[in-house]
């Protein structure tokens, strides 16, 4: 069987078994395609390579300038692939078992100050239907901490404006209920009344925030919109990421004393350690303020 066919069998297996998102599956496919392209040049296959071949491949990637984070993601995909090939008896061993992960730098998530968030949220011209949509989306994102993928795929049946809640189906098909808040609720109502009908052009759509072609927005389109408003707000776009408002949501909650387990629940994190990064952000902020304003800082 060809290597490409084995990869597709593997991806189908983990998509069903692990309920991974399409974005994760696409990342795995991209990484593993790079592996089999390298193997072809070495006249090797997924079945006859050994651990030294994998180490050589990873070493070449690092020498080519790929970041440790990219290499760690690739290694994760490779481990899952070879575990699958071993389990399904395509191989008699797992050559990835002896590989060590590259050491990753501890990075704090990028976030905005409360004033920067206010400036960003006030940037759209709400008299324009498209920008009214963007305003409602950003308000909802900051109010709930949704992932961008969760936001753009949000459907009408999963939002209850009267109760002020959204039902989110997140990673691993895990469901959570998140309150919206008054400000976001107001702007969603405004969009539903005055913006959404204009964007739909008489068509029907299940998604709350359709594109100007009445389709579901892509993550890339929303990220482009965020950067547009950041530039209008004099915010350095190099300090941003697509999840900047999600990070701001969590960081500002922690700064104001929110219980970490509540933040974990709202974000949909399965592990509290993932949420604890925001306590480090808060500590870094306090340290910065102390150094800036204390006479002996």
From Swiss-Prot:
Record-annotated Core-binding (CB) domain positions: 1-86
Cross-referenced InterPro entries: CB, DNA_brk_join_enz, Integrase-like_cat_sf, Integrase_catalytic, Integrase_recombinase_N, Integrase_SAM-like_N, Recomb_XerD, Tyrosine_recombinase_XerC/XerD
The entry's keywords: Cell cycle, Cell division, Chromosome partition, Cytoplasm, DNA integration, DNA recombination, DNA-binding
The organism's place on the tree of life at top rank: Bacteria
Active site per database record: 147, 171, 243, 246, 269, 278
Domain Tyr recombinase stretches: 107-291
Record's GO cellular component terms: cytoplasm
SUPFAM superfamilies: DNA breaking-rejoining enzymes
Subcellular location per the Swiss-Prot or TrEMBL entry: Cytoplasm
Pfam family, one: Phage_int_SAM_1
Key word Cell cycle present: yes
Gene3D superfamilies to which the protein is assigned, alphabetical: 1.10.150.130, Intergrase catalytic core
Keyword NADP recorded: no
PROSITE patterns, A to Z: CB (PS51900), TYR_RECOMBINASE (PS51898)
Entry GO MF terms: DNA binding; tyrosine-based site-specific recombinase activity
Record family assignment: Belongs to the 'phage' integrase family. XerD subfamily.
Function, in words: Site-specific tyrosine recombinase, which acts by catalyzing the cutting and rejoining of the recombining DNA molecules. The XerC-XerD complex is essential to convert dimers of the bacterial chromosome into monomers to permit their segregation at cell division. It also contributes to the segregational stability of plasmids.
Subunit description: Forms a cyclic heterotetrameric complex composed of two molecules of XerC and two molecules of XerD.
Protein name, entry field: Tyrosine recombinase XerD
Organism: Pasteurella multocida (strain Pm70)
Lineage: Bacteria, Pseudomonadati, Pseudomonadota, Gammaproteobacteria, Pasteurellales
Encoding gene per record: xerD
């Amino acid at each position: 069987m060809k290597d490409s066919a084995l990869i597709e069998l593997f991806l189908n297996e983990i998509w069903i078994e692990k309920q991974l998102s399409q974005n994760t599956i696409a990342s795995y496919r991209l990484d593993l395609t790079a592996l089999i392209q390298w193997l072809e040049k070495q006249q090797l296959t997924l079945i006859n390579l050994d651990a030294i071949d994998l180490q050589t491949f990873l070493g070449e990637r690092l020498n080519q300038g790929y970041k440790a984070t990219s290499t760690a993601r690739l290694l994760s995909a490779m481990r899952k692939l070879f575990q699958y090939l071993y389990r399904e008896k395509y191989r008699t061993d797992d050559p990835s078992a002896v590989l060590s992960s590259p050491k990753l730098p501890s990075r704090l998530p990028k976030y905005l100050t409360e004033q920067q968030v206010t400036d960003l949220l006030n940037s759209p011209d709400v008299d324009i239907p498209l920008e009214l949509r963007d305003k409602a989306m950003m308000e909802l994102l900051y109010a709930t901490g949704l992932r961008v993928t969760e936001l753009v795929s949000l459907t009408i049946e999963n939002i209850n404006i009267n109760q002020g809640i959204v039902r989110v189906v997140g990673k691993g098909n895990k469901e959570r209920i998140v309150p919206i808040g008054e400000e976001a609720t107001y702007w969603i109502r405004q969009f539903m009344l005055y913006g959404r009908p204009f964007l739909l052009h008489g068509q029907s759509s299940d998604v709350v925030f359709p594109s100007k072609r009445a389709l579901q927005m892509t993550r890339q389109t929303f990220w482009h919109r965020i950067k547009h408003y950041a530039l209008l707000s004099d915010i350095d776009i190099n300090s941003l990421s697509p999840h900047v408002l999600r990070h701001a949501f969590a960081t500002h909650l922690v700064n104001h004393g929110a219980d970490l387990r509540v933040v974990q629940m709202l974000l949909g994190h399965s592990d509290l350690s993932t949420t604890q990064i925001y306590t480090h952000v808060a500590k870094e902020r306090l340290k910065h303020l102390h150094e800036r304003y204390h006479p002996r800082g």
